Amino acid sequence: MKFLKKLGPVRTVRMAQVWGMGLSATLPALVSTGAWAQASATAEEGQTLAPVVVTGNPLGGNELIAPTEQVGGAELRQRSQSTLGETLNGLPGVSSTYFGPNASRPVIRGLDGDRIAVLNNGAANTDLSSLSYDHAMTMDPLLIERVEVLRGPGVLEYGGSAVGGVVNVIDGRIQREALFDDQGGITGKVDAGYATGNKEQSGAVVLDGGTNRYNLHVDAMSRRTDDVSVPKDLSCTKGGVTTTSRTLCNSASDTQSGAIAGSVFFDRGYLGASLSTYESNYGTVAEDEVTIKMRSNKLALEGELRDLQGPFQSVKAQYGQTDYQHTEFEAGVAGTVFNTRGQDLRVQARQVRWGQLDGVMGLQFDDSDFSAVGTEAYAPSSKTLQRAAYAHEEYATTWGKLSAGARVESVKVDSYGVAGVARFVPGSRSFTPTSYALGSLWNVATEWQMTANLSANERAPKHYELYANGEHVATNVEEIGNANLDLERSVNVDWGLAWKRGAHNARVQLFQHQFSNYISLEGTDLSATPPQYTYTQVQARFVGFEASGNARLLQGHDTVDWNWRADQVQADNTSTGQPLPRIAPYRVGSTLRWGRGAWNTRVGVDYYGAQNRVPDGQLATGGYTLWSAGMSLTSKLGGYSALWYARLDNATDTLAYSASSILTQTVPGKVPLPGRSLKVGLQLQF
């Protein structure tokens, strides 16, 4: 942790410094090469080559057993929102925690929080977004190169707790392979956008340059929004004055982020580093005058040695260190201050192939310190230490492949209490979670493929599940931890069938998660003000399906495609027979796409069913239909490759509420989904 003290001065880095440092480091090297044409060709090729999925794919294969979704390039620009959760919302099996337009995490198969692993370039992403729904994530879609979503629990390299799946955000800051030849070059992109619904003004710049021996990277982004428009009149009280308008009160935001990074390449590997900063000031929407000012600074180191002698052919290491803080303000007055500092190290070795057997094994170390000081602190200061060892093996067969994985962890959670606050009691708990996974892939016939996964997972309770004791304003309840919680255990089954013929494809996934002691926040005194809830272990079951496909309706000078998608999850507390809360309803969607040369257009519709399966005392959510449309054009502009794009969201300005948002229950009617909005943008690449 000593290095954190050295990292401390980075807190004062502003966007101007990020730009200045990055450009001063990069431009001299780039200009000296004079190889702009080479960079332009590389950038264009990068658009056409589909990258190999890296998440949960340590062996670099083209066929994955775990159900996987990848979003990048023009598709990512078309669906990009201000949060990662809303950007991915609508993918098969993926919903969001929607806490207004500024704070939203992905929900996979009805599971959220720490049951979803959110990674940055395959390494841990440290923030406090899983602690509370009003805490934003420290990454912005404007600087994302692509996102990989793995559904299901079998990816044990990233933790046995990720029962729902893994979301890996790839930003390309540390390059693992050279982008240029020995003559060198420069490549980059500039993105600018505007949206009518929240008056969003956004922009981003990404630059890479170097030779076949090194790469330098700099990026920066800015996004400013006003209160988002909604399809109904809402009241807003600020400074004692109440007004009414068709906007969501206290939903404005101001966000900046940037990074400088570099990689050095040698004959048998690479070594890279990046330094990034993220700052955001946004309204929390649940309360009219509460805002959060956040900043996060991160150092990342990464390297790999290849072509080794002995039992391993390569060794890869990743190290990250994060210093995160946010302050909650009420009517401009600083209140509770949340801090977390963490560092993580992963070392992974790939074994020499033994016949048809290939695999990796690794070690992972995670340390994090948490503190919250102020009147709204509901969890004490704590420290979490985690050590883990894991292995993943694959055996190739004539008909497909088999996989097996195992992970064992040592987790220690210490509560230090808070000086002068009697309700926070010091304590210490230790756990040894173990998880196992089996998978198989069959090429059952030409164009047909079947997958199956079975896993047994264990998750150690988080510090707030053990030691929380106080009012949680974001959820409007008093949260009481349970220091006697045991490991959360689950048995998980996943089965999939996929078909592909040219541009036609279809797939379906069936899954079930069976928990013997699911950690749930259960009401223990609902008559209190605020209601009292305690973390309790119950039996629970999640069962559901995901399906999607594409049909090429017209092939020729024009192409017409019909995409379809559907999903549903049913989650129950089987100890009480009650449904579990905040589960998305069944969804059915369809998109018609037309393409001609550089032009692409689409019209889509998504139907969200009513969610009547809610626990006693909670509100049902009505069904609704959302229409959308989009258009893009690729062209040349001043010698650069240009992508012009436009997207119309909620075209009919439909009033709708999210069943997976806590706000639908805690402040009924106050936070509808955004209304009609048109976003236009331009991305230049060179």
Where in the sequence are the language-model features?
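Flexible loop and strand-edge segments within Gram-negative outer membrane beta-barrel domains
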Residues: 251-255, 268-315, 320-342, 375-377, ...
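Gram-negative outer-membrane beta-barrel transporters
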Residues: 43, 357-359, 398-402, 505-507, ...
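Acidic, small-polar-rich N-terminal luminal/periplasmic segments of exported/outer-membrane proteins
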Residues: 45-179, 458, 495
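C-terminal beta-signal and adjacent terminal beta-strands/loops
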Residues: 231, 458, 514-516, 633-686
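Outer-membrane beta-barrel signature, preferentially recognizing the C-terminal barrel domain
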Residues: 182, 289-308, 338-340, 426-439, ...
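Signature of Gram-negative outer-membrane beta-barrel scaffolds
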Residues: 358-449, 453, 460-461, 471-473, ...
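N-terminal Sec signal peptide and the immediately downstream disordered periplasmic leader
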Residues: 1-93, 117, 177, 208, ...
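Periplasmic-side early beta-strands and strand-to-turn transitions of outer-membrane beta-barrels
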Residues: 175-176, 184-191, 195-294
